[in-house]
């Protein structure tokens, strides 16, 4: 059986080293469209595996550990978005990739942190309901001032990125005055304002490569530091609290187990209703159409 392993930039080093492809959510979605393998192992969290399954409905998609979930994605239910949308009938719904398949099915288009601004800019509607990350919504609003970006739900955020404060960043910058400051747009807007560069995980890696950065203070989950150090030689300083426990649930041993298994146990197999697959595929493909 031919197997292909995808891993997100936040995964443990041993998992990244076992992967055929490592990237951010956008890169993994693009990769998933081109995979020609019997089994795809998605090393990340639940919503990532659902996107891979939607783009590969006839392939076996499995995860190393079914408990790897995203707290931000779990905060919003499809019913809540459906009800909120009724209150704003003239608004388009842009759903961040960090959502369940059921929530994606209620949207007009999906986006990732790498292309959120581009997706929102490309829509004809003046009002945009943006779910579920309020910090990313604020970042988009800043860069698309001619549209009204309505964040939903209230206080939706990634707890890891939201925990990074301006004082945290100032302290690290005072200790490393020669370092460039790079952060993820899931961070609060006031933190983004302090950065030399704001971007998705792979955009941050590309920045280090392009700018030949010798040292960075990095405001995102610490797993990215391994890839940057390995591929660019950049010294990476990360706040100690920026660790996502869900992203660390997968281990090299668990990946090895699903690679060796002739039959993967049911909890590790990603299954979606055919109608849901069609709806998720539609919003993902709409994203590709708007940003091609």
From Swiss-Prot:
<feature type="binding site">
    <location>
        <begin position="96"/>
        <end position="98"/>
    </location>
    <ligand>
        <name>iminosuccinate</name>
    </ligand>
</feature>
<feature type="binding site">
    <location>
        <position position="201"/>
    </location>
    <ligand>
        <name>iminosuccinate</name>
    </ligand>
</feature>
<keyword id="KW-0808">Transferase</keyword>
<feature type="binding site">
    <location>
        <position position="8"/>
    </location>
    <ligand>
        <name>iminosuccinate</name>
    </ligand>
</feature>
<keyword id="KW-0411">Iron-sulfur</keyword>
<dbReference type="GO" id="GO:0034628">
    <property type="term" value="P:'de novo' NAD biosynthetic process from L-aspartate"/>
</dbReference>
<feature type="binding site">
    <location>
        <begin position="184"/>
        <end position="186"/>
    </location>
    <ligand>
        <name>iminosuccinate</name>
    </ligand>
</feature>
<comment type="function">
    <text>Catalyzes the condensation of iminoaspartate with dihydroxyacetone phosphate to form quinolinate.</text>
</comment>
<dbReference type="GO" id="GO:0051539">
    <property type="term" value="F:4 iron, 4 sulfur cluster binding"/>
</dbReference>
<keyword id="KW-0963">Cytoplasm</keyword>
<comment type="pathway">
    <text>Cofactor biosynthesis; NAD(+) biosynthesis; quinolinate from iminoaspartate: step 1/1.</text>
</comment>
<comment type="similarity">
    <text>Belongs to the quinolinate synthase family. Type 2 subfamily.</text>
</comment>
<dbReference type="InterPro" id="IPR036094">
    <property type="entry name" value="NadA_sf"/>
</dbReference>
<feature type="binding site">
    <location>
        <position position="70"/>
    </location>
    <ligand>
        <name>[4Fe-4S] cluster</name>
    </ligand>
</feature>
<feature type="binding site">
    <location>
        <position position="244"/>
    </location>
    <ligand>
        <name>[4Fe-4S] cluster</name>
    </ligand>
</feature>
<feature type="binding site">
    <location>
        <position position="158"/>
    </location>
    <ligand>
        <name>[4Fe-4S] cluster</name>
    </ligand>
</feature>
<dbReference type="GO" id="GO:0046872">
    <property type="term" value="F:metal ion binding"/>
</dbReference>
<keyword id="KW-0662">Pyridine nucleotide biosynthesis</keyword>
<dbReference type="InterPro" id="IPR003473">
    <property type="entry name" value="NadA"/>
</dbReference>
<keyword id="KW-0004">4Fe-4S</keyword>
<feature type="binding site">
    <location>
        <position position="113"/>
    </location>
    <ligand>
        <name>iminosuccinate</name>
    </ligand>
</feature>
<keyword id="KW-0479">Metal-binding</keyword>
<keyword id="KW-0408">Iron</keyword>
<protein>
    <recommendedName>
        <fullName>Quinolinate synthase</fullName>
        <ecNumber>2.5.1.72</ecNumber>
    </recommendedName>
</protein>
<dbReference type="Pfam" id="PF02445">
    <property type="entry name" value="NadA"/>
</dbReference>
<feature type="binding site">
    <location>
        <position position="25"/>
    </location>
    <ligand>
        <name>iminosuccinate</name>
    </ligand>
</feature>
<dbReference type="GO" id="GO:0008987">
    <property type="term" value="F:quinolinate synthetase A activity"/>
</dbReference>
<dbReference type="GO" id="GO:0005829">
    <property type="term" value="C:cytosol"/>
</dbReference>
